């Protein structure tokens, strides 16, 4: 289903305090269990430390109020929130684990859960899940739940995720004679639409219809073309130089040749945030982007900015609207003093009510399936916001998560350097992916 949205001035009537009473319910169910796990004794609260990189804006406001709700709704666990800057949080976490003084709960990358579990940097939480009757599995989207396991034991709980989609300028569509209610459905149509949207004055491009590598990588288009198979398949086999992936890289190179590297580089030099965003400013007609990009439009686009959202187009009709997603999980670092209390807080953060609240204030795609479903028709979201969540929920059905293989944790540079060589004209797409295939196969062999 295609979601078509129009900019509204009042996008969200929900306020942070409005959901406080509702959130007490999410915590209430965990009080007795926390007591059973001896989280607190003699009437004293167990103090735990929670690290994340949400340091400003709506996410910080939301998480701080969620923590306050948790702390005041029960008398056994007290959570202290510690902001750590993006990039620093994980190096500091490793240092704290090595020093024997880690935080109690931390937000971590969803694609590297197995690496941390294998390295004994995180805590096995399987026993806590089993004590709850294995009810957690049904809470989350299946492809997210699969990421938290190492050797059949869970080491994390999924928190949020994302998915890549197309944003397109509906007014530009009308100007170019395109139907604004019918975005491109295949790669062939995407090319046709982009050519119609292009505006050129002499040798100068006033508008570029679409360029596939602005905001997405070649890896996303490769899996889109290859039936959702990324550089590795589900069995861990290296699948870099498949025919479809070679065709995908050739397709990307054709886009670069059409506009020219100089044009692409000069456009990129003009890109910025806010009103300088190339999609908002009209420099680009169609933009492939994480669906959370919607928050940027809410904050910076004019009130009358008229845009649509659609799935990434199929490689060819019937091949599937495959997309890529990432996300984050909640983990208990190895050596945390109070894992029972930590797990209770993690359950709270992934409960339906709390996930709804965080989603309402961030437009993150939450890991809790029921929370996302509720947000589709949530009364505190306007029609536009509800449509974004409906689009996200549907798109997750064809969204692929790509956990880093244990036998090739450092494979990405080997692939990227070959793709870069092709983009620079030093080798063909076939040569680039053949070389990447050989290099990664060698890496896997070394790590057997």
Describe the function of each predicted region.
Residues 174-175, 180, 199, 394-448:
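Conserved C-terminal helix/tail region of periplasmic/extracytoplasmic solute-binding proteins
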Residues 65, 69-143, 174-177, 182-185, ...:
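Extracytoplasmic "Venus flytrap"/periplasmic binding protein-like
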Residues 1-49, 72, 431-434, 438-448:
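Short, low-complexity disordered leader/linker segments with a strong preference
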Residues 110-165, 222-224, 306-310, 377-384, ...:
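Hinge/lid segment of periplasmic solute-binding proteins
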Residues 75, 143, 310-311, 360-413:
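Long, aromatic- and glycine/proline-rich binding clefts that accommodate carbohydrate-like moieties
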Residues 193-195, 237-266, 312:
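Glycine-centered hinge/linker elements that transmit conformational signals in sensory
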Residues 68, 72-73, 78, 176, ...:
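Extracytoplasmic/periplasmic substrate-recognition and gating elements
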Residues 150-159, 164, 174, 188-241, ...:
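Extracytoplasmic/periplasmic solute-binding protein
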């Amino acid at each position: 289903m295609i979601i078509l949205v129009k900019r509204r001035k009042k996008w969200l009537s929900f306020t942070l305090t409005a959901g406080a009473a509702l959130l007490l319910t999410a915590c209430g169910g965990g009080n007795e269990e926390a007591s059973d796990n001896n989280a607190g004794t003699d009437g004293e609260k167990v103090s735990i430390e929670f690290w994340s990189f949400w340091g400003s804006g709506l996410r910080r406001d939301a998480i701080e109020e969620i923590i306050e709700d948790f702390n005041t709704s029960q008398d056994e666990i007290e959570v202290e929130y510690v902001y750590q800057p993006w990039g620093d949080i994980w190096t500091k976490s490793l240092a704290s684990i090595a020093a024997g003084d880690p935080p109690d709960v931390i937000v971590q990358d969803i694609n590297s859960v197995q690496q941390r579990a294998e390295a004994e940097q995180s805590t096995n939480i399987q026993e806590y899940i089993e004590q709850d009757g294995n009810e957690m599995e049904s809470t989350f989207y299946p492809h997210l739940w699969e990421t938290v396991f190492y050797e059949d034991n869970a080491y994390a709980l999924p928190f949020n995720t994302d998915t890549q989609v197309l944003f397109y300028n509906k007014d530009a569509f009308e100007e170019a004679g395109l139907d604004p209610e019918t975005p491109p459905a295949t790669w062939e149509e995407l090319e046709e639409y982009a050519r119609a949207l292009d505006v050129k004055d002499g040798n100068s491009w006033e508008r570029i219809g679409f360029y596939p590598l602005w905001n997405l990588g070649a890896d996303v288009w490769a899996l889109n073309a290859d039936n959702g198979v990324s550089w590795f398949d589900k069995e861990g086999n290296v699948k870099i130089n498949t025919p479809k992936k070679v065709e995908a890289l050739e397709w990307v190179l054709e886009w670069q040749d059409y506009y020219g590297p100089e044009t692409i580089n000069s456009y990129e030099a003009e890109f910025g945030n806010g009103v300088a965003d190339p999609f908002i400013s009209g420099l680009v007609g169609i933009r492939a982007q994480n669906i959370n990009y919607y928050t940027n439009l809410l904050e910076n686009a004019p009130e009358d900015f008229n845009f649509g959202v659609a799935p990434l187009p199929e490689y060819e009709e019937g091949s599937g609207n495959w997309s890529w997603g990432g996300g984050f999980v909640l983990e208990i670092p190895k050596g945390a003093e109070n894992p029972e209390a930590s797990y209770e807080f993690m359950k709270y953060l992934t409960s339906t009510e709390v996930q709804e609240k965080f989603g309402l204030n961030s437009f993150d795609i939450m890991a809790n399936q029921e929370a996302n479903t509720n947000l589709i028709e949530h009364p505190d979201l306007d029609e536009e916001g509800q449509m974004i969540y409906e689009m996200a929920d549907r798109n997750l059905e064809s969204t692929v998560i790509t956990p880093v293989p244990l036998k090739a944790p450092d494979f990405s540079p080997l692939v990227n350097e070959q793709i870069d060589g092709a983009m620079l004209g030093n080798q063909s797409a076939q040569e680039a992916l053949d070389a990447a295939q050989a290099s990664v196969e060698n890496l896997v062999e070394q790590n057997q």
